[in-house]
Amino acid sequence: MTGSEMMNKALTLLGYTSDFGRTSAEQRFISRAIFVMNSIYADLHYTQKNNGFKALENLEDEILLSERILNDVMPYGVAMLFAESESDGDNLQLFSMLYNQKRLSLTSGDSVKDVMTTPI
């Protein structure tokens, strides 16, 4: 998925669309998109890896994260930062909660191991 596709997905989640359901390609979103995208991209990259982050240089660059993160987590973080930049308090509150819950699910383990200490 490219940065442009991610931006459109986030703007659609926020409801920042035209009467025909098309996302707004207004300059105010495009000019902030790289910063917004790289902020969330770096945050999510480091939940999976300890190094090797390469920031997006333009909106046509591919975002190198797992399919799950691209479809289920990152759009909510990008939407959160766009809402913040628009001073859209209701959407900011909603997408902050959703992003943080979804991000937390990435770092929790898939299974729980019971450990019982025994005297030596």
Tell me the role of every PLM-derived stretch.
Residues 68-77:
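Elongated alpha-helical scaffolds
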Residues 1-61, 107-120:
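Conserved short "hinge" loops at termini or chain/domain junctions
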Residues 81-92:
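Short helix-capping/linker segments at secondary-structure and domain boundaries
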Residues 97-111:
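Short, mixed-charge aromatic SLiMs
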Residues 59-69:
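Short, mixed-charge amphipathic alpha-helical segments
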Residues 39, 76-81:
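Short, residue-level hotspots on alpha-helical faces of the histone-fold
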Residues 5-9, 91-94, 98:
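Exposed alpha-helical structural elements
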